[in-house]
Regions:
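A general structural signal for short secondary-structure boundary/capping elements
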Residues: 65-67, 138-141
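Short, active-site-adjacent cap segments at secondary-structure transitions
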Residues: 27, 59-62, 128-130
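Short acidic-glycine loop/turn motifs at beta-strand connectors
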Residues: 130-136, 140
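Flexible gly/pro-rich beta->alpha loop and the following alpha-helix that scaffold active-site loops
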Residues: 1-50
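Class I SAM-dependent methyltransferase SAM-binding "motif I" and its flanking Rossmann-like core
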Residues: 31-32, 38-100
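General beta-strand structural signal in soluble alpha/beta enzymes
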Residues: 21, 53-55, 121-123
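Conserved anion/nucleotide-ligand pocket segment
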Residues: 85-132
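Residue-level detector of flexible, active-site-proximal loop/helix-junction positions
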Residues: 2-4, 59, 101, 127
């Protein structure tokens, strides 16, 4: 559970050059970001030019909504999350872990289910998506 106060989150994010949000359960992560108020602070800092680095769940959290990731994650791990709206830092839906022995089938299920309705960006565990202003590029292995 989140123990950081909104003020301490703001203080830490202000003094650092970048914001790194790691992996784990995407639904639990977003639940805790919202509970602490960190979601709003992160968006504010990024909109003012701070670098955001998201890994796995941290990258999915940057999307407009995280509901699509239920195919590879467990929404029930976040019983208090009633709003699956993501941080909205990007206008696409990131699908990580393509080809991963455990997470790959979930990534493939997302592609199959959502490729015609969502703007998906699919990467494996050795790639990254770089967003600079309006330019989006895939960084190779």
């Amino acid at each position: 559970a989140s123990t950081a106060s909104c003020e301490s989150v703001e203080e830490k994010l202000t003094k650092n050059d970048m914001i790194f949000v790691g992996g784990g359960n995407t639904f639990f992560l977003l639940q805790e970001l919202k509970k602490s108020g960190a979601d709003k602070i992160i968006v504010q800092k990024v909109n003012r030019g701070k670098l955001y680095i998201g890994e796995s769940a941290g990258a999915i959290a940057a999307c407009p909504d995280i509901g699509f990731s239920a195919e590879m994650d467990e929404p029930e791990k976040a019983p208090e999350l009633t709003d699956r709206t993501g941080l909205g830092l990007v206008d696409f839906y990131l699908v990580p872990h393509l080809g991963h022995p455990e997470m790959g089938p979930g990534a493939e299920a997302i592609i199959e289910k959502y490729s015609s309705e969502l703007k998906l960006k699919v990467i494996d565990d050795y790639q990254a998506i770089l967003v600079e202003d309006d330019k989006v590029s895939r960084l190779p292995k």
